[in-house]
Design a protein with these regions (language model features):
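Single conserved hydrophobic/aromatic residue that forms the stacking wall/gate
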Residues: 1-7, 11
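N-terminal beta1-alpha1 ligand-phosphate binding loop
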Residues: 12-36, 40-47
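A short acidic, helix-capping loop that chelates divalent metal ions and anchors anionic groups
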Residues: 46-52, 77-79
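Short, solvent-exposed loop/turn segments at secondary-structure boundaries
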Residues: 51-55, 119-122
Length: 209
């Protein structure tokens, strides 16, 4: 892709296990609302703040993200964290993007409003806040008073519809043999069943197709 000195890059960093329509809608809404040139999805290698018993292999999460965004020319996926060993820190990734484009881009960082409430626990959070513009996605009716006044002055609030979709629920539904159609793109659904992700071997792929 081509980034000019006037360009703005939005950076959406998550586990994506799996990526779903909630992620995609939020990214597209941010691109349109803030007039961004592109959205870069960055699957984490080893998430620091989201310790789960197990997450899918990085390559699976990367390929599902590639499939999910393939029909949107404004979306791309980066392996910047997957290629870097050890825990994934946002500050390292943002700095790497800035160096890559000779500091000629403005980076927007999409996160949920609840996640931003924990920003002070992030590694080098004060420096991170200075390097990029945060976009905090909220649901209708979200109590903005939960955000510190200081935070409200440094972030942009973006309200999105209450899409009740979560990666955790999708994994659970696959384990229980329930349908995930219309929660994830068809290509991602197909990939999950083909690679037997999130389920016991005895569960059939009866919901595919």
């Amino acid at each position: 892709h081509c980034i000019s000195s006037a360009a703005s890059d939005v950076y959406k960093r998550q586990v994506f296990d799996p990526i779903h329509y909630g992620h995609l809608f939020t990214a597209e809404e941010a691109r349109i609302e803030f007039k961004l040139d592109e959205v870069i999805f960055v699957p984490c290698r080893e998430p620091v703040h989201k310790r789960e018993n197990s997450i899918s292999a990085p390559e699976h999460r990367y390929l599902m993200t590639v499939l999910a965004i393939s029909n949107n020319p404004f979306f791309e996926v980066s392996k910047i964290e997957l290629n870097r060993p050890g825990p994934s820190y946002s500050i390292d990734t943002v700095k790497e993007f800035l160096r890559k484009y000779n500091y000629e881009i403005k980076i927007f960082f999409i996160t949920g409003a609840d996640a931003f409430l924990e920003i002070e626990s992030w590694y080098k959070s004060e420096e991170l806040i200075k390097l990029c513009q945060f976009i905090a996605a909220t649901r209708p009716g979200y109590d903005l008073d939960r955000l510190d006044q200081g935070f409200k002055e440094i972030i942009k609030i973006m309200e999105i519809p209450a899409l009740s979709i979560s990666s955790t629920d999708i994994r659970r539904r696959v384990r229980e043999g329930k349908s995930i159609k219309y929660l994830v793109p068809y290509e991602v659904e197909e990939y999950i069943y083909k690679n037997k992700l999130y389920r016991n071997k005895r569960i059939s792929k009866k919901f595919l197709g």
